[in-house]
């Protein structure tokens, strides 16, 4: 396990990185998150109240650590945003990570951002990150991974970046490809106690006729969202999907009656997903305590990293014996 490893959790959100690192028994020695609601959820679950604005924290005041975890703010690079990148103050927060890494020289940086980060500004944004970390003393690797391939029924494509301190002599790193798991959204749904507010009752619901969703020869359904209808004009947040496929990407923002979770035909009803179902398809543990306000929970999971993807990356790092541990498996 990673019981001898100390890490810091920057732009911590509700602790997706914490969930993954904790499953290997690593020790969180510092967390930072400016959002008050996320601070509340983080402290409720991990007993640590994150510090606020990282730009106001001197690197000397941060404890020594082996790993930096950071899902740095993505709105500046998101397809759904204005894509201003480093021109947006949120985009420049990457350099806070570099500042801390330069001072502390941890062994590994584990970073995450939206898929569009790879292509933003014709690849220049990613190039700046790569060059900055290389100049800080690291070998840099990245890959876009889809959560659908890692045991959760949510299409969520994100770029994952791993940087190894150069003296570790990691000259190549192969990211995990995922697992072949025949799961569907239906497997992750709550069976009872669904809030009536989640159900959509409207006259402008249109379902495609004679749709037959069949498994393949191995009994597996398509590992992607399957659209089967619309509400209103079928714009973003107005599309209906089958639970026999995967969920669309959870979103912190967006409009439409199905905003943030999408709409699904479950039995005879059309409804949004519950906060508990969002927890499940993001891979957070059963013990995780949701924020008491559903609207806040939706936003938090819409911004979160998917935990099983991080676990797989960590296992890949361990298989390379980079952190010299005695176990390759995360706790369940």
Task: Label each region the model flagged.
Residues 15, 19:
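Glycine-rich SAM-binding Motif I of class I
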Residues 207-332:
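C-terminal target-recognition/interaction regions appended to catalytic cores
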Residues 2, 57-67, 77-249, 255:
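Class I S-adenosyl-L-methionine
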Residues 42:
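Conserved SAM-binding loop
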Residues 9-14:
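Class I SAM-dependent methyltransferase "Motif I" SAM/SAH-binding loop
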Residues 47-54:
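Conserved SAM-binding strand-loop segment of SAM-dependent methyltransferases
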């Amino acid at each position: 396990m990673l019981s001898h490893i100390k890490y810091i959790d920057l732009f911590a959100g509700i602790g997706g990185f914490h969930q993954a690192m904790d499953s290997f028994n690593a020790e969180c020695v510092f967390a930072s998150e400016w959002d008050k609601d996320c601070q509340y959820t983080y402290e409720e679950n991990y007993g640590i109240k994150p510090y606020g604005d990282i730009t106001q924290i001197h690197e000397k005041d941060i404890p020594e650590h082996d790993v930096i975890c950071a899902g740095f703010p993505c709105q500046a690079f998101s397809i759904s945003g204005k894509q201003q990148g480093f021109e947006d103050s949120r985009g420049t927060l990457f350099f806070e990570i570099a500042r801390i890494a330069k001072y502390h020289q941890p062994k590994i940086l584990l970073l995450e951002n939206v898929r569009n980060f790879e292509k933003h500004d014709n690849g220049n944004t990613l190039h700046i990150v790569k060059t900055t970390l290389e100049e800080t003393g690291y070998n840099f690797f990245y890959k876009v991974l889809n959560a659908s391939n890692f045991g959760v029924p949510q299409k969520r494509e994100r770029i994952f970046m791993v940087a190894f301190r150069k003296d570790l002599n990691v000259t190549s790193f192969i990211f995990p490809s995922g697992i072949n798991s025949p799961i569907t959204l239906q497997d992750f749904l709550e069976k009872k106690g669904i809030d009536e507010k989640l159900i959509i009752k409207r006259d402008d619901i249109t379902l495609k006729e004679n749709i037959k969703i069949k498994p393949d020869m191995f009994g597996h359904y398509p590992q992607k969202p399957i659209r089967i209808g619309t509400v209103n004009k079928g714009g973003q947040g107005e599309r209906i999907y089958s639970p026999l496929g995967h969920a669309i990407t959870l979103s912190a923002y967006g409009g439409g009656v199905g905003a943030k979770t999408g709409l699904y035909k479950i039995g005879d009803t059309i409804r949004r997903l519950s906060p508990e179902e969002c927890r499940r398809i993001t891979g957070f543990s059963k013990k995780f305590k949701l924020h008491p306000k559903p609207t806040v929970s939706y936003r938090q999971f819409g911004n979160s990293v998917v935990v099983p993807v991080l676990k797989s990356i960590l296992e890949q790092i361990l298989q390379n014996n980079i952190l010299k541990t005695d176990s390759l498996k995360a706790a369940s």
